[in-house]
Amino acid sequence: IQDAYTTSTNYPYATPYAAQRINYIRNSVKVVIDAYHGSTTFYVSEPGDPIVQTISRVFPGLLKPMEEMPEGLRSHVRYPEEIFKVQAAAYATFHMTNPQVFYNKEDQWQVPVIDGDANTATPMQPYY
């Protein structure tokens, strides 16, 4: 099972993230590739995603509802680490509810760092 993301750099009133400058990301599609004959099936996990809705109209029949995924596969669907990393980075700033605290960035969070080799610190990676 592969995660497929819908992204945009033009989502209104959203803060860009990383070098790609994306400001909209969703894990809207799960891709299953049959190991025996290579057929690919795309399952929609976020039917409300406007990009997925557009793809469905442009390529009718390509995307199937998540309910059609076999239960044996559906039980293996996990929350993607990449989305979690993006959300954690955004939440570090946007968890603040008081406008004054937010404006002054008085309660800015950071992802914990782990000491690495040769005095280098690396951000802690998410795990299941």
Model segments located where?
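Exposed beta-strand-loop-beta-strand "reactive/processing" segments of non-cytosolic proteins
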Residues: 1-32, 104-128
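Accessory, solvent-exposed terminal regions and/or long lumenal/extracellular loops of proteins
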Residues: 51-128
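Soluble extramembrane regions of membrane proteins in the secretory/endomembrane system
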Residues: 10, 20-77
